């Protein structure tokens, strides 16, 4: 049987589309973001999924249980965060370090009063 190039191309395209349609018909995805939905069903973070579920072994009744309807994040003792007594430079350094951009993480500083050989230690307490 002799086939022309056009016939071969049409046959290949038809088989490809038919097999793709058969695979799509077998899946039980209800939307076009099936991978995200599967990830959410498995407990993974999937922002584009139709439904995000709590991680395994987490009771939804234990989330946000302090009874405060205020949208401000609170410390475990219920107090808000304040920077009383901090200079602008200390606040800036604190913010930078929280973002993972601590400007002087390896700088040796005096972490105490200098009596207990603490002058030559790093900010994390090590001496190397």
From Swiss-Prot:
Pfam families assigned: YbgS (PF13985)
Composition-biased stretches (Low complexity): 24-44, 52-70
Residue ranges, compositional bias (Polar residues): 71-82, 113-128
Keywords: Signal
Domain of life, source organism: Bacteria
InterPro entries, per database record: Uncharacterised_YbgS (IPR020363)
Position of the signal peptide: 1-24
Composition bias, Basic and acidic residues: 85-110
Ranges for region Disordered: 24-128
Record-given protein name: Uncharacterized protein YbgS
Protein species of origin: Salmonella typhimurium (strain LT2 / SGSC1412 / ATCC 700720)
